[in-house]
């Protein structure tokens, strides 16, 4: 079963959107297997955004993700990576489709509420960076047979 990493950024937490964001993934039929509420350290932020280290916006990414609490999550399900990207919407909320998280609630590209892994390799790396194996729960909701063939 495929897994992805999602993080509700400080703006999503401060605006009280945690429940709404989680609801969207639960009602889609995905299974939450890891969840933590944390203040991100500068070191973790720099590791997470390491691919952008040489980009001019890198310092602002690190500053923002460490500016307040974050909800880190691991979700599981068939096609969860691609589906999560659709649920989240385009990176820039101004171009994100209505009905997506960013389209409905996003303000601007610097305050776009949520991060989601963009590929299986990235998801695996991010899950391992943010969670230990002991922090992930292997379980199956009773409704799983009704959602998957």
From Swiss-Prot:
Protein keywords: ATP-binding, Cytoplasm, Kinase, Magnesium, Metal-binding, Nucleotide metabolism, Nucleotide-binding, Phosphoprotein, Transferase
InterPro entries listed in its UniProt record: NDK-like_dom (IPR034907), NDK-like_dom_sf (IPR036850), Nucleoside_diP_kinase (IPR001564), Nucleoside_diP_kinase_AS (IPR023005)
Record localization: Cytoplasm
GO MF, one annotated term: ATP binding
Active site (UniProt): 115
GO biological process, one term: UTP biosynthetic process
Reaction(s) catalysed by this chain's protein: a 2'-deoxyribonucleoside 5'-diphosphate + ATP = a 2'-deoxyribonucleoside 5'-triphosphate + ADP; a ribonucleoside 5'-diphosphate + ATP = a ribonucleoside 5'-triphosphate + ADP
Cofactor(s) the protein requires to work: Mg(2+)
PROSITE patterns: NDPK, NDPK_LIKE
PANTHER family referenced in this protein's UniProt entry, alphabetically: NUCLEOSIDE DIPHOSPHATE KINASE
Function noted in UniProt: Major role in the synthesis of nucleoside triphosphates other than ATP. The ATP gamma phosphate is transferred to the NDP beta phosphate via a ping-pong mechanism, using a phosphorylated active-site intermediate.
Similarity section: Belongs to the NDK family.
Name of this chain's protein: Nucleoside diphosphate kinase
Organism: Nostoc sp. (strain PCC 7120 / SAG 25.82 / UTEX 2576)
């Amino acid at each position: 079963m495929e897994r992805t990493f999602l993080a509700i950024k400080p703006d999503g937490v401060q605006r009280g959107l945690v429940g709404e964001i989680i609801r969207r993934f639960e009602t889609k039929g995905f299974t939450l297997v890891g969840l933590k509420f944390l203040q991100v350290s500068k070191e973790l932020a720099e590791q997470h955004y390491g691919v952008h280290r040489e980009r001019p916006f890198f310092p602002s990414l690190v500053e923002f993700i460490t500016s307040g609490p974050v909800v880190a999550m691991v979700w599981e399900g068939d096609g969860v990576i691609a589906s999560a990207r659709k649920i989240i919407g385009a990176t820039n909320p101004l171009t994100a489709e209505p009905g997506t998280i960013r389209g409905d609630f996003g303000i601007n590209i610097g305050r776009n509420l949520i991060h989601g892994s963009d590929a299986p390799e990235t998801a695996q790396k991010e899950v391992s960076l943010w969670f230990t194996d002991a922090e992930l729960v292997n379980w199956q909701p009773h409704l799983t047979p009704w959602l998957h063939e």
